[in-house]
Structure formats: C-alpha cells, structure tokens
C-alpha cells in the first residue's frame, strides 16, 4: 500500500500542473463594474484579469443600448499592471452602455465578454 503512495502523489501533482497550464484569462474586476448604476459618467473603462493579457491583441468596444458604437478602435493600454487594460471614454450622457471586450491571454487563447452599466441622470 505504501509503495503506491509516491506514484499517486506524482500523478496528482502532474494533473494539477496540467490543469493550471490550460487556464484562460478570467475577468476579475471591471471599472465600471458589471451592472453598475452610476450617477456620474466614468472617464475610462478598466478590465483586470487573473493573468497578464497581450495588450497589442486586445480590444474594448463601448456600445449604447441601440447597438450604436460609442468607442471603437481606440488603442488599448495597460493601466495598473500587465493584468489590467483600459480605454479612455468620451463624455457620456445618461443611458445604458455595453462594454464588449476581446483579449489574448498569455497562454494564446482569445477570451471574449460583454457586460452592461447604466448612467442615470443625477437631477
């Protein structure tokens, strides 16, 4: 029984390493946050992932609730570190907006996502 213990431990460790090697970038934090209701328009969109992303192959698009593109083809830049990317925003009026993003994680996989936030008139 004890002779198999080192083999089982080695197998477990190999499986654990293999699972981590195929992990993709996961969105951990966003500014504005998903489903946020804001009373002041944000100045930028910042997306923070659990691992570094390739800024040159990443894009962020801002759309309104009529699917009109508000911001597109703006150069994405690193914000806080290699895990965070963002774009500056023009002055936004009240309404519902959708952040659509595509990033290339360091493992070579594309990750896409979309979320909304709302700007309410503060009058």
Briefly describe each language-model feature range.
Residues 22-41:
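N-terminal edge beta-strand
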Residues 38-40, 44-51, 109-123:
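Extended, polar beta-sheet/loop recognition surfaces of beta-rich domains
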Residues 93-102, 113:
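A glycine-anchored, Pro-Gly-centered beta-turn/N-cap motif
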Residues 47-73:
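Short, surface-exposed alpha-helix to beta-strand junction/turn motifs within ectodomains of secreted
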Residues 10-11, 21:
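Cleavable N-terminal signal peptides
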Residues 1-9:
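Bacterial N-terminal signal peptides that target proteins for export
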């Amino acid at each position: 029984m004890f002779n198999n213990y080192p083999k089982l431990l080695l197998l477990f460790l190999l499986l654990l390493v293999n699972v981590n090697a195929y992990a993709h970038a996961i969105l951990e934090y966003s500014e504005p946050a998903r489903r946020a209701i804001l009373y002041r328009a944000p100045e930028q969109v910042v997306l923070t992932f659990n691992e570094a992303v390739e800024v040159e192959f990443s894009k962020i698009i801002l759309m309104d609730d009529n699917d009109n593109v508000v911001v597109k083809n703006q150069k994405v830049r690193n914000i806080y570190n290699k895990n965070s990317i963002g774009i500056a925003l023009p002055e936004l009026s009240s309404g519902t907006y959708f952040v659509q993003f595509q990033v290339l994680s360091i493992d070579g996989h594309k990750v896409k996502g979309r979320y909304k936030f709302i700007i309410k008139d503060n009058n």
